[in-house]
């Protein structure tokens, strides 16, 4: 599903979903990078405003979090932790379903 792609592909998640979707992601243990981007887009239902915030976030990412086309080391480590959490969850789900067969 599209909402899991940022975690799999190691990018900062900015997922356009229903309001307060970030609460579910945080509950699952994912880092949403609230300390470096504006995550208020999760709490607005106005699409134009949501996309304005996300557009500003892309500028922050490009100007402050990337060096020579790569994420800064501290950001990259956090992205890899998100990826690991996602993959572990998938592995657990797969084996649970497999054992049910």
Q: Where do the language-model regions lie?
A:
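Pol beta-like nucleotidyltransferase catalytic core
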Residues: 3-9, 13-101
